[in-house]
Amino acid sequence: KNAFFIFDEQRVVGKGAWVKSFYKITQNNEWILLSATPGDCWTDYIPVFIANGFYRNRTDFNNQHVVYSQFCTKYPKIDRYLNTQRLVRLRERILVDMDFERPTVSHHENVFVDYDKVKYLSICKNRWNLWENKPIETASEFCYLLRKLVNADASRQEKVLDICKGRPRVIIFYNFDYELDILMGLGYGKDTEVAQWNGHKHQPLPEGDRWAYLVQYNAGAEGWNCIKTDTIIFYSQNYSYKIMEQASGRIDRLNT
């Protein structure tokens, strides 16, 4: 009580035990919250808005600003937000930009790869699951299969190996398990150690001269850093701007 707390935004999302502890601490103490990516959507700001006294609780926020889709019965899906002008004003009240100069400059390079255009058009036209040999049933399955076809192309795998030949230590971010299977099956070389961080395994960062660290976005985009390499490969992109920025920041530190 009557102390000063500095929080890492990574833990202050959602509505779990960390957020509940955050609420208790902020009631009787002064605090600041550090974040490189404040939020993808308005619901990411709910814990901070509540801690500042703008809303009583999450239900109060939802009642004032959230409209759920009527066509999604399995789980609640947000259709749109109401009174976003107020949300913008509240966000401007709590965000403080911290300008600083980095000794390093990030270099992002787009690598162009190919994909099977015939199969791609076939999926679009026939709505047919080529892997399970059955009709596509939902829009989400349709998009997933198009993405799978593109991400599994051999040209993408070849580009990964080309980069690894010139960069002895790389972090590779991916989304899906089938991408992990592809990455684990690549021939990086006999002297290259391969480790992974995902929902199945959390292996430590390799210590050798040549390695590839395979990281699933949701598991390892936040909360750690690496100063042993200057190269990240995004095998596939994540839908979230916040996740992509956080993943990029694993090697973009003040001491790198």
Describe the predicted segments one by one.
Residues 1:
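Inter-Walker segment of RecA-like/P-loop motor cores
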Residues 10-22:
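Conserved ATPase-coupling elements of RecA-like P-loop NTPase cores
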Residues 7-8, 248:
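Hydrophobic residues in beta-strands of the RecA-like P-loop NTPase core, especially within AAA+ ATPase
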Residues 193-256:
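Conserved RecA-like P-loop NTPase helicase motor core
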Residues 105-190, 199:
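Conserved helicase/translocase motor-coupling segment
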Residues 9, 34-38, 174-176, 215-218:
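A short beta-strand-to-loop transition that corresponds to the Sensor-1 phosphate-sensing loop
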Residues 4, 21-102, 256:
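Conserved P-loop NTPase motor "coupling/switch" region that bridges the ATPase
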